Amino acid sequence: MQCRLCWIKPESAVTATSPTHVKLAPLAAGSALPIFLFRMSIRNLDSLFDPRSVAVIGASERPFSVGGTLWRNMHGSGFAGPVYPVNPKYKLLSGQPCYAHVDDLPEAPELAVICTPAATVVDLVRQLARRGTQAAVVISAGLTAEQKQAMLDAAKPTLLRVLGPNCVGLLAPHAKLNASFAHIPARPGELAFVSQSGALVTAMLDWAEARQIGFSHFVSLGEHADVDFGDMLDFLASDPRTRAILLYIESIEQARKFMSAARAAARNKPVIVVKAGRSEQGQKAAASHTGALAGADNVVDAAIGRAGMLRVDSLEELFLAAEILTRFKAPIGDRMTILTNGGGVGVMAADAAAAHGVPLVELSQPLIEDLDQVLPANWSRGNPVDIIGDAPAQRYVDALEGLARHPQDTGTLLFIHAPTAIVPSTDIARAMVPVIQPPKKRALPLISAWVGGPAVAEARELFMQAGIACYDMPEQAVAAIGMLQRYARNQAELSEAPPATQLHNGSTPDVASVRKLIQDVLASGRDMLTEPEAKAVCEAYHIPVVITRTVPADAEAAAAEAARIGFPVVIKILSEDISHKSDVGGVVLNLQDADDVRAAAHAMLGRVRKSFPDARIDGFTVQAMVKRKQAQELIIGASIDPTFGPVILFGQGGTAVEVMKDSAMALPPLNAPLARALIDRTRVARLLKGYRDVPPADIDAVVATLMAVSQLLADVPEVAELDINPLIVNHEGAIALDARVRVSSQLPAGAASFAIQPYPAALAETVEWRGQPLTLRPIRPEDEEHHRAFLESLDPEDIRMRLFYSRRTMERSELARLVQIDYTREMAFIATVPDDGGQEKTLGVARALADPDNFGAEFGIIIRPELKGSGLGRILMDKLIRYQRGIGTQQLTAVVLTENRRMRKLAEALGFRETETPNDETTLQLLLELQQPARQP
């Protein structure tokens, strides 16, 4: 497969050196995010990738040994600094002195590469740490768990970072660093590749070299005892040489660290993932439908999407995705229109669209009538838009302009051309290019497939020069559109920041009653709630449930209760030992009178005792028979993933739920947009939107149920598994017919264990200020427009004092990054008061961004110019300092202009000390030790 794509921008110089290698010049000045965005400090990782000196411990002259290969790679890479071999067997190696021990080296190497037996690694790391080495690559394999821990213990006191063990090493081509035993070097480029698999590292290098693909960094994590995916994502997110990050993942261990780093990186540049190791282990041990459906791979899928990354299935797709995501800048439509001169290639594209989940547009009548004016009578009058093989160049232009007049009815346009003898393909391209240039004025996002070889080569080149994505085959183009659409959806999920506690209708759940019920169940030695208990939990969270009563295992008692409820009814077996009642004949529906109930109860007891003789029979549940016309059966559930913590499931329900396998997973917390996105990832979502004579279902009711389950998981850590199955829904609403809940006091659950930290609503407070209430709270995505108004109100001189240049306007993407923050590592407190219209008015913001290890955080503060001297800055800084101190941050720092007297005075009053900025007389550094007693005003 070949992908030929260039994206031409006026401020960029682009050279296509091969079909899959495109080199872009650095972005123009001023394209960096301007306000309150600080570069993350990745402690000592720069010593891994850009060291001043390197030692190869275990270097050898043996041609086929790891030490020999590593020495030749490092010594011959063109690295500018000194490279020291360490091996007591040699006096000279490659004509230079070889040192017997680490202590014999003339200086402390900034980076050490260790390729000696496992038993030697701990002592070597200890020696290197003592000498002052900042980073080590441990190639050695076979370390025991105890040895790995001892290695980390030896490295920790001096913050020496360790890559590995059991890894191939790393390559940083721009630094001419090849600290690996790979068989070939990597070309310089703009892609970073990070892999857990060593074998894949070498295979990928070979594959990429054949296609002239270059890399900024190429990293084998090995067993990632220290440096892991989270560290690499943090480092690469702010690396200016890296345009996209490619990951090969087999397992993830620290979910919150990974998600926090992934979300931060995905806000800056595309992050594309190949995830291997699909496992069914979780299904085998599951006691619920949700557990059986929530395999580890489904959860990882949900995590990748929620972090704004894109998952692909192969190495080939990895590079296709990297190419299209880094070059295609137009907004992608959620549907596609195909414009072609050939029916066959159009059908191929339509088939590919179905396979990739790319919906085709149904052409509107106004659009059809518009195209009727410029196309022959026998055109397809549908999608694909087939303009017939004899089309002259002007017909292509007319069709394109006709579609562009209806952008809302067209979506993304896929143009497919097959060469004909009627008109040269080059003439068609020349005629179309003026219509599609420049990109900023293009009405439609456009991707093309010029099918063929020499006959379309020049036409393809013309489109590439016009900044249009070009592919050889329709299937490739459709796959690219599918990737763009999935990526856009994931990026939309990335921008959501729901609180942990938020019901859809604003109501408050009865958390206390649920906690008491569950504590009573656990105290009794049970871990499964009865059906009535599970439904009581649902009712406490305002999830509608069917009327359900419990009776002893007696047919007469069941008949009497049924009469009180009213016929028709359903009876079910009540047993702690039976999870899926239908499997043992433990459910009978639509019983019309007392005689039916008696007969069903007797028969049910016989069936259950025969098929499950050891089960404890606690009685029956009797419930009203709910009949809803044209209703769908759904499942909503939750379980605890061992890595990512609580997860939520939605899908098609009923007894065949595991057979249908129409479900999707999401990580809590959920708000309404995230709940709707979860629903839309299933096939049953199309049925819920209505079809033929079936009206659309009440999707709001389903959304409310999903949000209620999300809040339940946050409020009650003891919930280990939950099934609401079926939840039936139609246009009248939703109601739960059955529910199961398993509880445990041993699982790490609740909001504190969410892989994505919820919006910290509990941090909001109101204080008295100038005779009025002042709200201090964390910023949230919904603040975007208020924050824009705040920034536009600032005085340019104040902005210069804080940001060192004057600028008040910004792009929406820049503004979004200020209000869509990751509360795991960043905090922004805003101060607000009501304006004359009762809306919140932002008066100031104090922001801090912490290192990944939370050792230090850099802060910034800015307030409205008319409020200088009002005490607002002190209030905001006090709030920020209390928060950072409370989460264990050690130091709070900032860089200020020397002339910024007002900020310096405030900082002094708060206990900050000033130090000079090296080589810069215009700025000073402010530092506050947070874990020391606060200075009193």
Language-model features, listed with the residues they occupy:
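A short, sequence-level motif marking secondary-structure junctions
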Residues: 2, 592-594, 742, 779-782
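Low-acidity, Ser/Thr- and Arg-rich intrinsically disordered low-complexity segments
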Residues: 3-12, 18, 31
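Leucine-biased recognition of intrinsically disordered, low-complexity hydrophobic segments
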Residues: 5, 24-27, 33, 37
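Catalytic-core regions of core metabolic enzymes
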Residues: 36-739, 747
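Short beta-strand element of the conserved SAM-dependent methyltransferase core
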Residues: 571, 622, 741, 831, ...
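Long, contiguous binding/interaction regions
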Residues: 749-937
